[in-house]
Amino acid sequence: MQGETQQIQDALRDVIDFEIGLDVVSLGLIRDIETDDSNVKITMILTSPMCPMASFMMNQVHERASESTEKSVEVVMGKEMWHPDMMEAEARETLGI
């Protein structure tokens, strides 16, 4: 299932946080992708708890993940707070962090 998880993660790179201009994977917003025989559960967080684009971004994550797998997809909001240290190194470099 590792290949499937990677495939879903790669698809989620198309989902952009428009306030920052980078994808949700590079920003570290996708915290977990769990798969079993018929389901995918994606746990994500936002850069800000008051993000006005929260529902839009969750819908985008759901759509892209659903396009990359035949399984039922659920997207849930994680409880942890986002921190720039969660970003991939290249994303931090792009933003000068």
Regions found by a protein language model. Give the residues of each.
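Domain-level signature for proteins that mediate thiol-based redox and metal-cofactor handling
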Residues: 1-97
